[in-house]
């Protein structure tokens, strides 16, 4: 081992600072409003040493700029909530790592691949707090200690060596600089909306900038005596410590040309600090590669070996990752024709890119006397690769016919070699009326080599380096009656989150291309030949129980005579009456139901010349734009006391999540306004709506919170994981989606739905008819306990309601019983009015005092009241339970199941 070049003590990591950074007062990232979470204190380590060998100048105000920079790091950290051991990591190899809960997980629970919410990333500006830095992990995070870790330099070098971490810090000069890291898959979800790639759904926040400190790679290679090119030293390979499944089992590895590694202008370092602290586990602790201007995939984390070779890295991940193949090459062709091994398709340097971040997705700009008197400021970020400076960013409001040049903010100074390693920010003021008359906003950037972004997306099998114009769609909406605003839509939302104009367009394309049972040929025997045409305004008039029309795939159906027969109850139709419910219908109905619908078709929708209240309609084509603006009124804050709006979806924010057991979670969702109640009558349910795997998914749930909770509602949900139940190998779509939702994300809610409403003191409204009971036989199976629980909760909350409740609750195992603690508590405190009996298929616990098996006549006779004119049976559970256990056994007891059985 070589001797130390310097003999200095190193008992701690010094709080490193970057080269100078002085944010402009007019920076586009200023003034962004973002709520501050619980703060955590930033601890500045003592004896800070500043290294400025990479500065572009020797300005006297460097110290002031460095101090200002330290304050930026401190401010960023103070606005973060503490990182925690996330329950989603339980049962994985990463359960020891603390992470920020707001990070959006893109690949389920494990491995951890995530990006921050875009607005939160931009709130912090130039420097990203480490917990919000995007993460790309191919597998579990390797565990290692500072004292035991070594980095080996070997291969075509004169003196192969292993260096400890202390040697890397003490024996070499350090280099410290801000670098923007970008995953090559940034904006990949846009590509997946066109055609599925082999990669997961990165949004537009797979980009982050932090301050990195480490040893210049060239210094390590020089110490070891790297051979010359003539002696075969052509490539420098990097190998990490993570053991991965690719290629039958291998380490993550890649390589770069030796000329790059030895070029001082490229600032390549073996890094051990980030933002003045040791590396976080997800970012490569204790040491990793940083290669400015390159894609993140070349910057190997948890670096163990640096090998100088003649050939490129032979790692599976060097060839089967980070390539841009021609659009006609799919995964099968790439494998059969060995496209992976063609050197011309490898990705090294980043390409030019830009993104619109303000307006954010689903932001609504009210149009009123105040907003129209001042410009609206568009904002975003841009970057390029190879150290090239972004020289201009342009915005178009007319599809590229004309462009406006934005104001650029480059917070970094160039290095002494003239390189720019970081993102910059752009801003542009536009008139609100110009926005109102536009269909979309698009942005493109240029760098100093006059590279710019293509107009259209160019698909490739890995979905990498997507840099087409970033487009934000705009539509006129009506937040309140008689008032308008502009709602903005980004192309996608990251991961499996729903939303984005590309998802809507994809859904429409799939609907048009798929074989439609609703679009039958004229020769079809049961073809409804109705050809009458109706306008949207005419359809809207038919939104009541007296006349309920719906639109599905452009066809109009009169569902009035089907209201009473609909399995989901009258409300399920009425909530969509007078609207286009294509998405909702496709999401929850079978092909059989679609065929049945054909009997109710009365005509077709006129698709031109009508206006819709839907945000999906623009004001384009209006013959008199000024007349359209005439009725604009100043918007006022919403004063609604009830959140649910029939026929509309409302966005609700996930604010808390608790694990009750290994597969049961309690979710708390905030309502749109803090002073609202949900507005769900007791006995009814809501639909949760999300786009999962490019399709709208809607599932019914009953909240477990009381109806008068203000500002939020709660759900207790059993998670049906993939690969657990043989009959359902893919698990539950919505429950798994809920489990993967990060705090702070939104879910659409629609309701109220259902044909049963408990009105108090034993009174029910069922299909519009009154029913009364003094005693309730409540039979539930599995998650069907939630509507029963809701009714019980309402009864027990009213001191004047003396209704008696007899609960028989069936589950597969004891562990599957939901809300058991609450049910047992009620039965214990009020035994004269609440009686609870459990039935499980099998019991493995000693002391089980309840029934084992299935619900039988004997069990019901013993634990529910005899039928009478003041007794009603309530049931909710799987259809087989209702059909084979509830209905026949109640009939044997003498219940009139047509009149006295209410099935939720």
From Swiss-Prot:
Q: Which PROSITE patterns match?
A: CYTOCHROME_B5_1, CYTOCHROME_B5_2, FAD_FR, MOLYBDOPTERIN_EUK
Give, as one word, the top-level EC class: oxidoreductase
- Give the EC number: 1.7.1.1
Q: Which reaction does it catalyse?
A: nitrite + NAD(+) + H2O = nitrate + NADH + H(+)
Q: How is its activity regulated?
A: Regulated by the nitrogen source and controlled by the circadian rhythm.
Q: What protein name does the entry list?
A: Nitrate reductase [NADH] 2
What function does this protein fulfil?
A: Nitrate reductase is a key enzyme involved in the first step of nitrate assimilation in plants, fungi and bacteria.
Co-factor: note: Binds 1 FAD per subunit. Binds 1 heme group per subunit.
Q: Which UniProt keywords apply?
A: Disulfide bond, FAD, Flavoprotein, Heme, Iron, Metal-binding, Molybdenum, NAD, Nitrate assimilation, Oxidoreductase
Q: Identify the gene encoding this protein.
A: NIA2
Q: Where is the composition biased (Acidic residues)?
A: 56-65
Where is this chain compositionally biased, Polar residues type?
1-10, 35-50
Gene Ontology molecular function terms on file? FAD binding; heme binding; molybdenum ion binding; molybdopterin cofactor binding; nitrate reductase (NADH) activity; nitrate reductase (NADPH) activity
Q: Which GO BP terms apply?
A: nitrate assimilation; nitric oxide biosynthetic process
Q: Where is the Cytochrome b5 heme-binding domain?
A: 531-606
| Subunit structure as annotated in this protein's UniProt entry | Homodimer.
Binding-site list for FAD: 699-702, 716-721, 728, 733-735, 786
Disulfide bond in keyword set: yes
């Amino acid at each position: 081992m070589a001797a130390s070049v310097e003999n200095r003590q190193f008992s701690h990591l010094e709080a490193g600072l970057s080269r100078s950074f002085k944010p402009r007062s007019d920076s586009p990232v200023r003034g962004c409003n973002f709520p501050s979470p619980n703060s955590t204190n930033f601890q500045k380590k003592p004896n800070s040493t500043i290294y400025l060998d990479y500065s572009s100048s020797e300005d006297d105000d460097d110290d002031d700029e460095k101090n200002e920079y330290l304050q930026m790091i401190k401010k960023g950290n103070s606005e973060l909530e503490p990182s925690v051991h996330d329950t989603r990591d339980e049962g994985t190899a990463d359960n020891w790592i603390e992470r920020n809960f707001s990070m959006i997980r893109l690949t389920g629970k494990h491995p951890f691949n995530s990006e921050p919410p875009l607005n939160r990333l931009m709130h912090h500006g130039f420097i990203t707090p480490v917990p919000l830095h995007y993460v790309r992990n191919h597998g579990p995070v390797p565990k290692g200690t500072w004292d035991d870790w070594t980095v080996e330099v070997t291969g075509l070098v004169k003196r192969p060596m292993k260096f400890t971490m202390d040697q890397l810090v003490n024996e070499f000069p350090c280099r410290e600089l801000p670098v923007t890291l970008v995953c090559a898959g940034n904006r990949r979800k846009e590509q997946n909306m066109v055609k599925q790639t082999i990669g997961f759904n990165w949004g537009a926040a797979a980009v982050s900038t932090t301050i990195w400190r480490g040893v210049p790679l060239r210094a390590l290679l020089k110490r070891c005596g790297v051979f010359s090119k003539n002696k075969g030293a052509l490539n420098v390979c990097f190998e990490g410590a993570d053991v991965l499944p690719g290629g039958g089992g291998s380490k993550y590895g890649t390589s770069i040309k030796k000329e790059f590694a030895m070029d001082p202008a490229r600032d390549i370092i073996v890094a051990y600090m980030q933002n003045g602290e040791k590396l976080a586990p997800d970012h490569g602790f204790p040491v990793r590669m940083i290669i400015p201007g390159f894609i993140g995939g070349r910057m190997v984390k948890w670096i163990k070996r640096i090998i100088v070779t003649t050939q490129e890295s032979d790692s599976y991940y060097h060839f089967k990752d980070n390539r841009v193949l021609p659009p006609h090459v799919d995964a099968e062709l790439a494998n059969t024709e060995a496209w992976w091994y063609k050197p011309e398709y490898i990705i090294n340097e980043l390409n030019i890119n830009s993104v619109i971040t303000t307006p954010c997705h689903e932001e609504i700009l009210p149009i009123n006397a105040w907003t129209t008197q001042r410009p609206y400021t568009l904002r975003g970020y841009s970057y390029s690769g190879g150290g090239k400076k972004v020289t201009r960013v342009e915005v178009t409001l007319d599809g590229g016919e004309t462009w406006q040049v934005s104001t650029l903010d480059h917070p970094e100074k160039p290095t002494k070699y003239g390189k720019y390693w970081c993102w910059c920010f752009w801003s542009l003021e536009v008139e609100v009326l110009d926005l109102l008359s536009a269909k979309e906003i698009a942005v493109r950037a240029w760098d100093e080599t006059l590279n710019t972004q293509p107009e259209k997306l160019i698909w490739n099998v890995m979905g990498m380096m997507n840099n087409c114009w970033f487009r934000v769609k705009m539509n006129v909406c009506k937040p309140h009656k008689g008032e308008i605003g502009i709602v903005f839509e980004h192309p996608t939302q990251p991961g499996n989150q729903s939303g984005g104009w590309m998802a809507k367009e994809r859904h429409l394309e799939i609907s048009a291309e798929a074989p439609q049972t609703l679009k039958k040929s004229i020769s079809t025997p049961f073809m409804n030949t109705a050809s009458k045409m109706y306008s949207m305004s005419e359809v809207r008039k038919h939104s009541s129980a007296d006349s309920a029309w719906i639109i599905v795939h452009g066809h109009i159906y009169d569902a009035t005579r089907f209201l009473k027969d609909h399995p989901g109850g009258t409300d399920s139709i009425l909530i969509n009456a007078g609207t286009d419910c294509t998405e909702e219908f496709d999401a929850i109905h079978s092909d059989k139901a679609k065929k049945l619908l054909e009997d109710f078709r009365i005509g077709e929708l006129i698709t031109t010349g009508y206006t819709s209240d839907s945000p999906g309609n623009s004001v384009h084509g209006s013959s008199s734009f000024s007349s359209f603006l005439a009725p604009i009124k100043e918007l006022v804050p919403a004063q609604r006391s009830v959140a649910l709006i029939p026929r509309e979806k409302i966005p609700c924010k996930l604010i808390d999540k608790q694990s009750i057991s290994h597969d049961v979670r309690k979710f708390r969702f905030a309502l749109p306004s803090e002073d609202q109640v949900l507005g769900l009558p007791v006995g009814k349910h809501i639909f949760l709506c999300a786009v999962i795997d490019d399709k709208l998914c809607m599932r019914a749930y009953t909240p477990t919170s009381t109806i008068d909770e203000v500002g939020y509602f709660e759900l207790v949900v059993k998670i049906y994981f993939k690969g657990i139940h043989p009959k359902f190998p893919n698990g539950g779509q919505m429950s798994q989606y809920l489990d993967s939702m990060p705090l702070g994300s939104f879910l659409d809610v629609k309701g109220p739905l259902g044909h049963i409403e408990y009105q108090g003191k034993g009174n029910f409204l069922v299909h519009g008819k009154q029913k009364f009971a003094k005693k309730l036989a409540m039979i539930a199976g599995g998650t069907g306990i939630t509507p029963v629980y809701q009714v019980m909760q309402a009864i027990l909350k009213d001191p004047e309601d003396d209704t008696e409740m007899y609960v028989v609750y069936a589950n597969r195992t004891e562990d599957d019983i939901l809300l058991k603690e609450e049910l047992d508590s009620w039965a214990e405190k009020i035994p004269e009015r609440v009686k609870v009996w459990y039935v499980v298929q099998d019991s493995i616990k000693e002391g089980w005092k309840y029934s084992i098996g299935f619900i039988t006549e004997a069990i019901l006779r013993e634990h529910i009241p005899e039928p009478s004119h003041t007794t009603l049976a309530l049931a909710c559970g799987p259809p087989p339970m209702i059909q084979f256990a509830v209905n026949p056994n109640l009939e044997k007891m003498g219940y009139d199941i047509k009149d006295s059985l209410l099935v939720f």
